[in-house]
């Protein structure tokens, strides 16, 4: 079975549409390979991360931005004082792709020591 390290080691593939989104069963199987806390709903995956303070929250946001730039796959993020909600979907196909799970795994790896 693939695990978070396997997903995090993969590279996102360019996606410009014309590819069907993942089926629900495929998305559920990939979701099991991520850290707990990720939720699947409305053709997207999301997770809320909590921190001690604003500085730690913003450091996390900047780290996610770096991952996004490296993979050329960008999440929606909602940022508060000590929380950040990260949501992935692949807009070009109107649903989830493997890229969303690859990036989610890379985000999880930011917090694993």
UniProtKB/Swiss-Prot annotation:
The protein's enzyme class: lyase
E.C. designation(s): 4.2.1.96
GO molecular function: 4-alpha-hydroxytetrahydrobiopterin dehydratase activity
The keyword Lyase belongs to this UniProt entry's keyword annotation: yes
Keyword Signal on entry: no
Superkingdom, taxonomy of origin: Bacteria
Alphabetical GO biological process terms: tetrahydrobiopterin biosynthetic process
Catalysed reactions, semicolon-separated: (4aS,6R)-4a-hydroxy-L-erythro-5,6,7,8-tetrahydrobiopterin = (6R)-L-erythro-6,7-dihydrobiopterin + H2O
Stored InterPro entries: PCD_sf, Pterin_deHydtase
The entry's keywords: Lyase
UniProt family annotation: Belongs to the pterin-4-alpha-carbinolamine dehydratase family.
Protein name (record): Putative pterin-4-alpha-carbinolamine dehydratase
Organism (species): Nitrosomonas eutropha (strain DSM 101675 / C91 / Nm57)
């Amino acid at each position: 079975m693939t695990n978070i390290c396997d997903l995090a080691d993969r590279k996102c593939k360019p996606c410009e549409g014309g590819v069907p989104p993942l089926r629900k069963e495929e998305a559920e199987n990939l979701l099991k390979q991520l850290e707990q806390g990720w939720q699947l709903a409305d053709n997207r995956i999301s997770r809320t991360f909590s921190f001690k303070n604003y500085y730690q929250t913003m450091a996390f946001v900047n780290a996610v931005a770096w991952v996004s730039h490296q993979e050329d796959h960008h999440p929606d993020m909602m940022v508060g004082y000590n929380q950040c909600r990260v949501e992935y979907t692949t807009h070009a196909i109107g649903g989830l792709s493997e890229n969303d799970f690859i990036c989610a795994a890379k985000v999880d790896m930011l917090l694993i020591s």
